Amino acid sequence: MNTKILDQLEFNKVKDQFTEYLQTEQAQAELRDLVPMTNPERIQNQFTEIQEMSEIFVEHHGFAIGSLRDISEPLRRLELDADLNIQELIAIKKVLQASADLSRFYADLENVELIALKRLFEKIEAFPSLQGSLQSINDGGFIEHFASPELQNIRRQLKACDDAIRQTLQDILKKSGHMLAENLIASRNGRSVLPVKNTYRNRIAGVVHDISSSGNTVYIEPRAVIQLNEKITQLRADERHEMARILHELSDQLRPHTAAIANNAWILGHMDFIRGKYLYLHDKKAIIPEISDNQTLQLLNVRHPLLINPVANDLRFDEDLTVIVITGPNTGGKTVMLKTLGLAQLMAQSGLPILADKGSRVAIFQEIFADIGDEQSIEQSLSTFSSHMTHIVEILNTADSNSLVLVDELGAGTDPQEGASLAMAILEHLRLSQIKTMATTHYPELKAYGIETQHVENASMEFDTATLRPTYRFMQGVPGRSNAFEIARRLGLNEIIVKEAENLTDTDSDVNRIIEQLEAQTVETQKRLEHIKDVEQENLKFNRAVKKLYNEFSHEYDKELEKAQKEIQEMVDTALAESDSILKNLHDKSQLKPHEVIDAKGKLKKLAAQVDLSKNKVLRKAKKEKAARAPRVGDDIIVTAYGQRGTLTSQAKNGNWEAQVGLIKMSLKADEFTLVRTQAEAQQPKKKQINVVKKAKKTSSDGPRARLDLRGKRYEEAMQELDAFIDQALLNNMSQVEIIHGIGTGVIRDAVTKYLRRHRHVKNFEYAPQSAGGSGCTIATLG
């Protein structure tokens, strides 16, 4: 895009408004180089970056990069094999530290969905070793003692010599204090000296380094410290040499990474620039506009960014609208409206937020041209007809259908009749070339052109006849009218004269009356639109309030739900502990008395009332497999309340069923158990093992033994089956069980071991003998 338009519309002044929001020199440089873009994807990406930055600020209000110097010159010097000075190394050190901080920030970032910024965050490289090396230089520009053993040794010697000199001079001060002009140790030419009164200069042996301006004081380096001062001078030279070597070494460490460090610095600067754009958007109540794909424009409540209290206006360029002609007198803000449109486009195409309301839409133009002769503009510049036409010729020779043309006072500066004809012909050429154009003029002849010509629309700036002042309100679709008669009348001109003037221009008066009616209708429409907008704003506020209340309610609901879940879990834990106690009592008593069985059943039913097993995955699965027929004797069932397996033995006259559940006989209603399978199905080979204890053949171990195969099971499924298996084994008075878990990755085996170790009814357990499965099978003794 041509750079001339940037000066004409004062775009650099707009860019200057962003400076206060930037912290890094890199971002300042990016702002200086910023120019409008013509690639919609690049523009949209920058808008996405701003939007994502706003989402970051929702979670982290204080997000900032920090103040960073531009390190492009130090990096260039590194590439030329030059060594960096301390300040340059500090600047790079700060960039590396900021890079590490930004990486940590991204790693900890939650509740924010990023796309454009994610690519930036993930391109940052960390250099912990370089950061460690650069810690030897502190931010004050001092090379720390630990930078090298040699430097540490030199500084240790320096301190020793300095202490020795100070002690020697202190001794002289005590002995010869009356000879001194001041009771202190001074320094001249980098050497420690004493201020001796001139009358005693021969009483203290040493080298004179200076004499005061009055001649009364002589600065003498006593002979006793000359050798020590010589040593200090040498040590200072050694220190400088060692520091230079350290700077060279640090520069060499940085040299291979210049490209990556430069990339980090660019990302930090660009992130700071995005942050600055968001802060501008927030402070100025700006927005990110939509991008149209057909050169349509819709600017809602758009404001001029350089004015202190700009009037907001709506402006649209529909697809079938090519030319807008703003007619009317030379006051009222026509030029400002031209610049407002141009600046909104330049800002948007530069990836900057614009001063408008949500719902605004911008087009993407390859070029924007302007001819603005601003007698009344922000920057005044006079334009003769010749220079005016020269600019118009350049525009007509260059502009095409992908351009936006802005012309102020088209055809001005020459004979009104010829100027109006010329203006009309130029606008017609632009219309036929399908070039989006906005032009201002005070020629009344162009009103008719705007009304009669397709794809052309009139517009004007509102004028308040009551106050005789312009309101700066843009009225699209309404041509401008002269207010001369009304102004003259209100200023006190004789009514007879005004009437005579109106009679002399009857035709124009009729047109003005029509325009006046249009203005009134437009003003009324705008008032209604403003009322609608106010209602929309109230609705938005209401919606926000409702959303806030909903979020607060959801938060309270989640807290109460979590509290309830904890209480339920405590109930379940208590119930499980009590069930373990019941099972242990059942196991301990080989002979049960009837009343004990009834008591145990009562306790189990009481537990069932406390624990809701409706969400148990095993029960849900069993329910899905329930046969679509009535239950019958011999069917396998699962008792819903306990999750225990049993078999139907008989049906009572009242419709209830008798079931054998382990050692216990139970009376159940039809809705208190789930049918698993038929007897015939039970005799068929099982494709998949379920939670059931299979009687094993007698082994040499005491008591019966059961086996559970967990191979191929998922962790959660295996643990559910193991838990039910142990419970059933205890109910069946098993003394020993086998759990086949295989070797595999060891996850199931370790889980089985952990489960058995904490189960109170498992006396001990061990892997099976090698011949019986080895570490792929665990034998547990119950008791």
UniProtKB/Swiss-Prot annotation:
Coiled coil: none annotated. Residues 708-783 form the Smr domain. The keyword rRNA-binding applies. Keywords: ATP-binding, DNA-binding, Endonuclease, Hydrolase, Nuclease, Nucleotide-binding, RNA-binding, rRNA-binding. Belongs to the DNA mismatch repair MutS family. MutS2 subfamily. HAMAP family: MutS2. This is Endonuclease MutS2. It comes from Streptococcus thermophilus (strain ATCC BAA-250 / LMG 18311). The gene is mutS2.
